[in-house]
Amino acid sequence: MLTPKLKQQIRSSFDGAKTQISNFSNRSSQNKMIAEISKTLMSEYPDTNPIICVEAPTGTGKTMAYLVSCLPIAKSLKKKLVIASANVALQEQILNKDIVEAKKYSSVDFEFALAKGRSRYVCIRNLINLTEDNSSSTTLFEDALLWDEKPTKNDLNNLYEMAESYSSKSWSGEIDDLESPPENSLWQKIACNRFTCNAKNCEFYNDCSFFNARKKASNSDVIIANHDLVLADIINGNNVLPDVEECIFIFDEAHHLSQKALSHFSSGGSTEFMRTSIRQCQGSIDQIIKITKSTATKSYIEKVDEALKELTDFISELEFSDDIYLFPIDGIPNEITNLTKQLFVLFNSCLLYTSPSPRD
C-alpha cells in the first residue's frame, strides 16, 4: 500500500520537476498517470497483477511521470528500476536528458547505468590472442581458430590501436565508444560472447569491460536498457540484468514489444521441408528394413508423412496477414494441437526404431 512517506516522496519529486524542468506545463493526464502507476505498483487494486499499460499522446510528459512515481517506489521496495526503450535514439534521450533531469528533481538519491548486450564489449583475451607475437611471424595467420583468412594490414592496425587504447584506459572496451569502429567481421573475432567466455575463470576477469559494466549495473538503482536486451536476457537466464523478481520494468514505446517478443520467443519450422526430408530418407529407411527385417519404421514414416500433410492442409486454410497468423486469445485450435502431439509421438517412435541399441 502507498504509505504517507511514499506519497510525500512522490509529491516532492513532482514539485521538484515543476521547478527544475524548463517550460514545465501541468497536465491533468500526467497527474493521472503518476497516480495510476503508483497505485498499481503498490497493490492498491486488490486481486490484480501489478501491471499497468498507459497510452498517452506525445507531449503528455510520460517519461517524467513514470520517473516521478517509479523512482521512490523502486527504492522503497528495494528493487531495480529497469527502463527499456524500443530504439537507440530514445535510449540515449533517457540516458542523457531525462535521467539527468530526474537526478535534480527526484526526492530520492539514485545511481544509474546503461546496460548493453555482451557483444557490444571487447573480449580482452581474444584481442590479445590476435595481437600477441604476430609482428614477425605468419604462424597466427594459419590458425583457423583465429583467422579464416589472412588479415589485412588495416585489420592488424585496428587491433593494435584497440589493444593500446584499452591498456592505457583511454577506451572503455565498448564498440560504441570507438571513433572509428571496425568492420563487423573483425569485431566479431574480439567481441565477448557467452559461448567462449570463461567468466571468473578467465585471467582477465578483473579487467573485463563486460563484467565491469555488469558490476556497475548491479550496483545501480536504475538500469537503462532496450526491449531486445531485456527479452534476450530473460531467455539466457539473466546474464546481464538482475532476476525479474528483483526488478520493476518500464517498457517505453511498448507498442513495439509484441513484435519483438514474437521474434525472441518463437521458433519456426517448415512442414513441407520436413516432408521432403522424410522422402529423401526413403533409401536409408529401406536399408534399415532389410537389416532389421522390420516394417515398423516404414509404417511410422508413412504416418509422419500423413500427419504432416494433414497439418499443412489445415494451416493453409488460415487467413494469414504478412505471412503471420495470430491465434485468438483462447488458444490454438484442437486440430493443430492434436496433430502436433501426434507428430511428437511419431518422431520419437521413429528415433527409437532407427537409433542403435546400447548393445550394438
Positions of predicted regions on the chain:
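Signature of the SF2 helicase/ATPase Hel1-core->accessory helical subdomain module
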Residues: 205-219, 227-348
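Walker A/P-loop NTP-binding motif
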Residues: 64-77, 100
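Conserved small/polar residues in nucleotide/adenosyl-binding loops
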Residues: 353-360
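N-terminal pre-P-loop "Q-motif" helix
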Residues: 25-41
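Hydrophobic "anchor" residues on beta-strands that sit immediately upstream
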Residues: 51, 80, 222, 248-249
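Walker A/P-loop
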Residues: 47-66
